[in-house]
Design a protein with these regions (language model features):
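Amphipathic alpha-helical scaffolding segments comprising HEAT/armadillo-like alpha-solenoid repeats
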Residues: 91-103, 122-136, 155-168, 188-202, ...
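Extracellular/periplasmic ectodomains of large secreted or surface enzymes and adhesion receptors
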Residues: 4, 36-37, 44-48, 57-101, ...
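Structural detector for internal amphipathic alpha-helices that build alpha-solenoid repeat scaffolds
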Residues: 76-92, 108-123, 133, 141-156, ...
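C-terminal, low-complexity/hydrophilic appendages and adjacent surface loops
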Residues: 1-27, 33, 56, 62-65
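Generic recognition of stable, solvent-exposed alpha-helical segments in well-folded globular domains
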Residues: 30-33, 37, 108
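Sec-exported extracytoplasmic/periplasmic mature domains
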Residues: 17, 43-47, 187, 201
Length: 240
């Protein structure tokens, strides 16, 4: 298929007849029962394994500060059912569902609610107003995605301050998240240039720029590489 800005919400391929996975059968009536079976198995699997991959990375590492992910998952201490459902709604549910998710007490559900709005082709004025009200969400992951949703739908002035502020956070996972959003905004986020330059200096101080990407280093030295990737890509776009 032709390259595009997004992928299909669901993909189903006949790997024997179509080894290059070019013909997506997810909407094929002939394959409906297979798709239903795989959906059911997917839900069973992520439930049985207590899949924590739906947590934003900054929130996950905060949870893992005292217990491992395995211990948390097996003990049922993370309310995964609602999180899994919120993630599954992205690209499928109505705007109303995502606005409701923004009001959840669970920060990860708010995070997925914001992503759900960001990927919609367009959102209402009411949704934009709600995103503006939520831009100071106490969860940094949710806040960054709320800013992303606003920026994606044209409200750069209200989105950028939250992203720029996040670029100065002590946690480089948060910085990486914000830097990636700014990188993807490209020249529309021109006013973030100084914050990006400062973050790049910080990253290069932690991990020298000439360190090969194939060298895996612990902690912030590894995260600094990803901050550097996004910062350099953004600055290169500004120079084009």
């Amino acid at each position: 298929p032709s390259a595009g800005p997004t992928r299909a919400v669901e993909e189903l391929y006949d790997c024997q007849a179509d080894p290059q996975d070019l013909n997506n059968l997810a909407k094929s009536g002939k394959h409906r029962e297979i798709l239903k079976r795989l959906r059911t198995e997917h839900v069973r699997h992520i439930t049985a394994t207590a899949d924590l991959g739906f947590l934003p990375e900054s929130e996950a590492w905060e949870l893992f500060s005292k217990q491992t992910g395995w211990e948390l998952g097996q003990a049922g201490r993370v309310p995964l059912a609602g999180i899994h459902q919120a993630a599954a709604q992205v690209g499928v549910a109505s705007e109303r569902v995502f606005l409701k998710n923004l009001d959840s007490d669970n920060p990860t559900i708010r995070y997925w609610g914001a992503i759900g709005l960001a990927v919609r082709p367009e959102i209402s004025g009411m949704a934009k107003r709600k995103l503006r009200r939520k831009i100071s969400d106490p969860s940094l992951a949710a806040r960054i995605e709320i800013a992303n949703a606003l920026a994606t739908h044209g409200d750069i002035p209200n989105a950028l301050p939250a992203l720029i502020d996040s670029m100065q956070h002590e946690n480089l996972i948060v910085v990486t998240h914000a830097a990636r959003i700014i990188e993807l905004l490209g020249k529309k986020a021109n006013s973030a240039k100084y914050a990006i330059e400062e973050a790049l200096k910080r990253a290069d101080k932690i991990r020298p720029a000439d360190t090969p990407a194939t060298v895996v280093l612990p902690g912030d030295k590894d995260l600094a590489m990803f901050v550097s990737f996004s910062c350099r890509a953004f600055l290169n776009k500004l120079d084009e």
